[in-house]
């Protein structure tokens, strides 16, 4: 059975390479694995080879989140010719979905004839998980598709082995293979011991295991507990280790939709003994309560308003090596700027600092791929820890002793541009800020807009 994987998942590339070698021994001549790490454009020869490998595959998994447009176009040229099973992950090429009797065509609305939305597909998959166990044909194929997507999203070596075995058993004619185990998936939210990536759900047990200390502030560290598209655990642990000397850290691994784990997240952040947290770091891209498929942003904003504490957003460069990042003038790609800086800012995030980037592992000549891993940028991790320590110290300082600068526009220098702002009455805004500072106990003087003009 020929498998072709076109993916942006770094862990999948690594583990599939290892599994290919194992399967050649365990199932000689029965499994052929072709891989393409689709994070950048390929040379013409490799692009043509990819198209042919897609067209001739018995099973194609397509995962093109953020892939270059030319790669996407080439993949779809191959899919147009493919007669095998096609498994799109996420929104990638959903119109080509085909697994046994289950296909995108069979799910199209009779009136609209459009490809089903991600929400529709999710509902049908959930239904098929139950019915597929007892009903043959299309329902079984729907259930299998749901399982295969879970195997891939949580791309451990065990899950990817089960992915291959399920396909070979149910679609490759190898019925002697035992039914693979269910996908090993993390909880929607849990407290993690980052030393061994084990997790607990009870706050008391976690505090005891992590040796929380009375009198220290508590800090929440949110991260993605699944390994798609990269395994961030090494970088998250580096942040955790840098914070632990001066605060109690709640390492909260999240997976799934925010609305599913919001109640439990609130209970952790507002724990009666160790909460409420004094500061939150969120290492996940996009917005707190919304991802690439959307969400309910107002839920995230409501939670952050309730906490009323600093909200920091360290992030990971998953498409650049550390060397590329150091040499780059811009630092971040446009897509990284959008999902890791602009969108978090809409939730009120501050200090969007890159703390990790990719490093290249030994080249895999057999599959012609360059495996990569995410690794911490030590200097930036230390900078984040320093910022956190200073924010925590600032929370303990009386307002009357705090020093604040208010910087207003004056460019090019001149009276006409002083406090400039298109369609804004900046003097009134600054006046109101000063009044609020006085009310909150800061050592300053409330000035009217007219008095501000006189001062400057």
What are these regions (language model features)?
Residues 1-456:
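An N-terminal assembly and electron-transfer interface module characteristic of large anaerobic redox
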């Amino acid at each position: 059975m020929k498998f072709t994987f076109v993916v942006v998942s770094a862990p999948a590339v690594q583990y599939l390479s290892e599994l290919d070698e194992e399967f050649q021994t365990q199932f000689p001549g029965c499994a052929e694995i072709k891989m393409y790490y689709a994070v950048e454009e390929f040379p013409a020869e490799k692009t043509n080879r990819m198209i042919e490998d897609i067209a001739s595959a018995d099973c194609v998994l397509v995962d093109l989140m953020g892939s270059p447009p030319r790669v996407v176009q080439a993949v779809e040229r191959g899919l147009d010719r493919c007669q095998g099973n096609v498994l799109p992950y996420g929104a990638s090429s959903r119109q080509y979905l085909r697994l046994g009797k289950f296909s995108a065509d069979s799910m199209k609305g009779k009136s609209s004839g459009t490809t089903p939305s991600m929400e529709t597909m999710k509902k049908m998959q959930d239904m098929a998980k139950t019915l597929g166990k007892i009903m043959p044909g299309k329902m079984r194929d729907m259930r299998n598709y749901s399982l295969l997507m879970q195997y891939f999203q949580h791309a451990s070596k065990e899950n990817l082995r089960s992915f291959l075995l399920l396909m070979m058993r149910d679609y490759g004619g190898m019925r002697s293979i035992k039914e693979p185990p269910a996908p090993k998936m993390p909880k929607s939210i849990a407290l993690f011991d980052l030393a061994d990536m084990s997790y607990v759900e009870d706050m008391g047990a976690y505090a005891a295991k992590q040796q929380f200390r009375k009198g220290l502030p508590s800090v929440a560290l949110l991260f993605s507990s699944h390994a798609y598209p990269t395994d961030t655990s090494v970088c998250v642990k580096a942040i955790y280790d840098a914070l632990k000397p001066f605060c109690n850290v709640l390492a909260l691994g999240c997976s799934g939709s925010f609305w599913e784990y919001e109640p439990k997240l609130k209970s952790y952040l507002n724990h009666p003994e160790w909460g409420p947290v004094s500061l939150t770091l969120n290492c996940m891209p996009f917005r707190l309560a919304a991802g690439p498929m959307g969400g309910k942003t107002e839920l995230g904003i409501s939670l952050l308003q309730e906490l009323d504490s600093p909200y920091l957003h360290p992030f990971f460069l998953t498409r650049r090596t550390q060397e590329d990042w150091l040499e780059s003038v811009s630092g971040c790609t446009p897509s990284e700027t959008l999902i890791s800086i602009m969108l978090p800012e809409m939730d009120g995030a501050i200090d969007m600092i890159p703390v990790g980037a990719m490093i290249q592992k030994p080249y895999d000549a057999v599959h012609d791929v360059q495996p990569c891993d995410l690794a911490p940028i030590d200097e930036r991790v230390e900078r984040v820890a320093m910022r956190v320590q200073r924010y925590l110290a600032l929370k303990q300082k009386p307002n009357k002793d705090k020093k604040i600068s208010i910087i207003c526009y004056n460019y090019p220098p001149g009276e006409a541009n002083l406090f400039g702002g298109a369609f804004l009455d900046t003097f009134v805004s600054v006046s109101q800020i000063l009044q609020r500072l006085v009310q909150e106990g800061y050592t300053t003087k409330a000035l009217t807009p007219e008095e501000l003009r006189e001062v400057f």
